[in-house]
Amino acid sequence: MGEEIDLEIAKMTDRIAVVVLKSPSMSDVDAIAAASGKIQQFVRENQPQTLIFDFEAVKFFSSLVLGLLLDIRAKMTAYQGEVLISAINPQLHRVFRITNLDRIFRFFPDRESAVEAASSD
């Protein structure tokens, strides 16, 4: 059996939730699929206006994580929801720039500033 992605999903308000990614490495196909299932279920059941992905602990991820983020974004866009990304390290942020995904996600230096921005939207 492969790695398991440690994550926590917390509702900050009725409109804002945070997915705290606690695993330093996110590359196992089955683990990413399982994490995606948990997050998608949360989105279906709660329909947060804003979902913040906190990458503070993450040092490496495979391209499957980009797919996960795009899938969640597509589901949330259907009801005018938004995905924000916080505390991502510069090397991982570079992946978003290279793929032009930095144009569709908003980035914040830390979880607190992302929550603050979402609260003022």
Residue ranges and their predicted role:
Residues 14, 90, 112:
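Residues that form or immediately flank small-molecule/cofactor binding pockets and catalytic motifs
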